[in-house]
Amino acid sequence: MTRKSRRLILIAACGAVLALALGLILSAMSGSIVFFRSPAEVASQGVPPGTRFRLGGLVKDGSVKRGPDQNVEFSVTDTNATVPVQYRGLLPDLFREGQGIVAEGTLDAGGVFRADTVLAKHDENYMPREVADALKAQGRWQEGGGKEAPKDAAKPASADATLGQRSER
């Protein structure tokens, strides 16, 4: 075997090993990749039941219904479409109507999104990038952030507060 053919075989073997490693990495990650969709995309694209994804938008005013055993039903909207959501568990402290949220779960055959987790925005100006991009694409984005904080929202601790104190809920 010539030197050139040995080098070519070595390069081909390294390429095959890299391709195999990349294939294994992608197959391992396929179960953990979750796509983001807005309510308008869910309505227009016809997401198959059982598909896992993240749903982002605003909690529709007047849609929150609390049931027994921490069951909560609400609707998520992007002003173009609305998706009903069912969730069982404790909601974040910042969850409220008109609030930007991202919920992760699956869509059932009846078009109801069954959420496993619900995340609320962190402060008055925070909006998940995917939600902001979807609102911008639909021409619904308003510069300057969100709404004012509600009167019952937690206030930041004063500068002279000691570390030992706990906030009351």
UniProtKB/Swiss-Prot annotation:
Belongs to the CcmE/CycJ family. GO terms for cellular component: plasma membrane. Residues 1-7 are cytoplasmic. Residues 135-169 are annotated as: Disordered. Heme binds at residues 122, 126. It is found in: Cell inner membrane. It is a single-pass type II membrane protein. Its main location: membrane. Heme chaperone required for the biogenesis of c-type cytochromes. Transiently binds heme delivered by CcmC and transfers the heme to apo-cytochromes in a process facilitated by CcmF and CcmH. GO terms for molecular function: heme binding; metal ion binding. Residues 145-154 have a biased composition (Basic and acidic residues). Residues 29-169 are periplasmic. Keywords: Cell inner membrane, Cell membrane, Cytochrome c-type biogenesis, Heme, Iron, Membrane, Metal-binding, Signal-anchor, Transmembrane, Transmembrane helix. GO terms for biological process: cytochrome complex assembly. InterPro entries: CcmE, CcmE-like_sf, NA-bd_OB-fold. This is Cytochrome c-type biogenesis protein CcmE. The chain crosses the membrane at residues 8-28. Pfam families: CcmE. It comes from Methylorubrum populi (strain ATCC BAA-705 / NCIMB 13946 / BJ001).
